[in-house]
């Protein structure tokens, strides 16, 4: 319903912030990363939001980056993962590190989140790994005939697409990186520029 809310940060609490937008105070649940990125009370901010509607409650969830919001949306699409569990996961890792954890089957990183056990972490990996590999990934191998992408580079491109890169930008970021490196190393080098 709301894509973003732009206003003044008026309050920070343990798991939510309050943003005043034109005289209306919005209580927005957020991850620890977004809480830290929001800055000081009194500062103008833009929060990308998701409105979660249940029978008796409407909760607003917000993020300081579109990448974090996109990862949140991916997480709540997983069977058994609600908005609070998704926030918990995003509070212990960044979207980039989370994407690497999913692609490399790193259950340990995901289970660091409060309330997320090994079974839920495995379900998250199982359901999101395929989405991350196929999510709007368009690789034109005809133009890359001299440089066929390795599986690791393909997975790294998929992770970058999930993080908000266009498929062309992701391919360009990974193009010069050695395909024999691990997926995690390729992603780190691509993000470093």
Name each region found by the language model:
Residues 124-174:
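Strongly charged, low-complexity linkers/loops
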